[in-house]
Amino acid sequence: LKCHNTQLPFIYKTCPEGKNLCFKTTLKKLPLKIPIKRGCAATCPKSSALLKVVCCSTDKCN
């Protein structure tokens, strides 16, 4: 699996074994959904009051 790991959409890394999800974290309050954190995960991180987390399982989907 390949996941983006920076705010730039053309930079990505190959996830280590066991991390089969990509995630993207954005701030809920901003009108522009600029990712503040991206990467690989074994389980999907939880969203919070300020942060929205979206997970997916295909190459470069985050």
Curated annotation (Swiss-Prot):
Signal peptide: none
One GO MF term attached to the UniProt entry: toxin activity
A single cellular component GO annotation: other organism cell membrane
Tissue expr: Expressed by the venom gland.
Disulphide bridges: 3-22, 15-40, 44-55, 56-61
Annotated family: Belongs to the three-finger toxin family. Short-chain subfamily. Orphan group XV sub-subfamily.
Further details from the record: Is classified as a P-type cytotoxin, since a proline residue stands at position 31 (Pro-31 in standard classification).
Domain of life the protein comes from: Eukaryota
UniProt protein name: Cytotoxin 11
Phylogenetic classification of the source organism: Eukaryota, Metazoa, Chordata, Craniata, Vertebrata
Compartments where located: Secreted; Target cell membrane
Keywords: Disulfide bond, Membrane, Secreted, Target cell membrane, Target membrane, Toxin
Predominant cellular place of this UniProt entry's protein: secreted
Protein's job: Has low cytotoxic activity.
